[in-house]
Amino acid sequence: MKTGKANAVARAEQARAAGFVAPHTSPNPVDDATAPTWAQSGDRVTTAQGLRIDDADNSLKAGVRGPTLMDDFHLREKITHFDHERIPERIVHARGAAAHGIFEATDGLEDICAAAFLRRGAMSPSFTRFSTVAGSRGSADTARDVRGFATKFYTAEGNFDLVGNNIPVFFIQDGLKFPDFVHSVKPEPDREIPQAASAHDTFWDFVSLQPESTHMLMWVMSDRAIPRSYATMEGFGVHTFRLSNAKGETSLVKWHWKPTAGIHSLVWQESQKLGGIDPDYHRRDLHARIATGGFPQYELGVQVMPDTPDQTFEGIDLLDPTKLVPEELCPVRPVGTLTLNRNPDNFFAETEQVAFHPGHLVPGIAITDDPLLQARLFSYLDTQISRLGGPNFSQIPINRPLAPVNDNNRDGISQHAVHVGTTPYTPNSLGGGCPFARPDGTAYTHPPVAMERNATKIKLRPASFDDHYSQATLFYRSLSPIEQLHVAQAFSFELGKCVSPGIQARMIANLGNVDADLADTVAAHLGTTAPAGKVVDPDVVSEALSQTRPQDPIVSGRMVAILADEDTTAKLVNAYRTAADPLGVEVIVIGPHFGKLASGLPIDRSAHISDPVEYDGVVLATEPDEVTTTFVQEAFRHHKTIGVADSAMAEALNLPVNAAGVTLTPADFFEALGRHRHWNR
């Protein structure tokens, strides 16, 4: 019998024989050049102090069967570190996935913004984190929820963080209500349920008493809250920001991210099933797209509005975070392209420890007096200190700027820098006057903004904040009939989970001020009636708010299932693969078992572990049986593209022969796949 030491030696020899030394990957572009390049080096197990260990399998004991000895310093060090490996999760946005990328200012904003990274042709490394809001770290990706969309730009002038969501508005107008909102949507404190879900009494109790939430609720109950992929999800800065150019001229802007792959969502049944079948669905999808070279891309744009004294545009208060500016009134101006091209090397070190903050600004970009944004400036900085163990979180590699740092900050928990000199203060003479501040055109300058004349301290909101329903109506009326149906079904589902009938009644009354038909539909589902409301009909509708509007037929990153059996020919499967490869579509062959089919065709997945909700389209490459018929029919119910051999096979599957999205050839199949869903059948 080999001893633990002999086993360790054997494993080491096997590793060296295989040419393996250490799991080194590409260095993080923001690593400090003076720090060790790798977290691990060499091929021997050591302690944290670099001491080589002769046996990593057995504790030190008094005899072979004796008690473990406390003088086993390696055991104590290893267990102690293990006991402290977890840090507090984010209070919100705990569940997330991220990727490195590169941002190129293809169009530039020099005329309105002095930021160097927004000059035409400038390129900046970046790190983007997507997330859900309500759920814990271990919750499912596909829950109905707002999605975070936060990007850190490592620019020559310092880090700039664009900390947004996939919805352009928010639930509340003032940051004072943020803890109340979060407490309401989190699991109820007596039972700690439900997880990652808003379908419960406390959430709807809060929002039904906060009419300002109504616009946001329309978005969250829409398909926007169940995206197909992070790569097919819009992003928004939510708030209004102030840009200034080299001349000091200012503009007000709203940030937009437009995915080049289009804007697409799951359907509700898919979202629910995927939560059990693959709770890591979005995380897995993002990683796979990047690993296979199908890099997600987003166009950054801004809506540019004049910086007027009242900070309004076309009657819309730009300081109200529950309001948007329709793109038909103010088109989005292209700025540049973000390409996510590298997966993190380590989830904890990068995705978990990245610290975003809306106050991480660069010259030319400033915040406004939006009361929710003002509170976020405090909250984001404060929470990092708790979550990351102290004030030195900016020294963590993923958070380090590329720009030189000389901030006079010293000491504190987890101080990684070794500061030299004796003058961590400004001004000084002993250090030659360094570091010093100088307004030389390269430093950050707050744009001068006139304050309200004779302003008094007061706890009030402007009257323009009182309109809580008109934009909710605008959003709902801008949706297609199928999207409106989904909104009504989502409200019915969520409110149906509430125990208190008073909550349901209040929310139905609120919906009556948005759209009478919507309120009546939800009320009927709940077995009640809706009171008459006061609906303000919008002057226009916004086509940009609908996901079913015509979009470019991009299919890159989609997954297609080919259902095969022993009678399936490799020729048929290869015909679909040949058509799919140049389009960036992944084809998965699903068979009755693992291994190969009689034709020698490899099987990627077994039918026993596959479900149609995982795929964007389905091809039946064999005669239908009970399993494949159920598979195809469910995909059809979800309005997906279906490929069959002929009309007889479609009839055998009980599918309408001439239904939209039911195709007979690879060419027709992939053309139909570009429409994402076929809502007209």
Regions found by a protein language model. Give the residues of each.
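Short secondary-structure capping/turn micro-motifs that flank functional sites
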Residues: G595-L597, V627, E651-A652
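A short, aliphatic-rich alpha-helical micro-motif
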Residues: P612-V613
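Structural alpha-beta junctions
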Residues: D581-I588, R637-T641, V657-N658
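Catalytic nucleophile loop
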Residues: S500, G617-T622, T630-N654
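A charged, well-structured terminal subsegment
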Residues: A660-R681
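Active-site-adjacent core segments of small-molecule enzymes
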Residues: K2-D567, N574-P582, E586, G591-I609, ...
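A short helix-to-beta-strand connector/capping loop
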Residues: L601, V657-G661
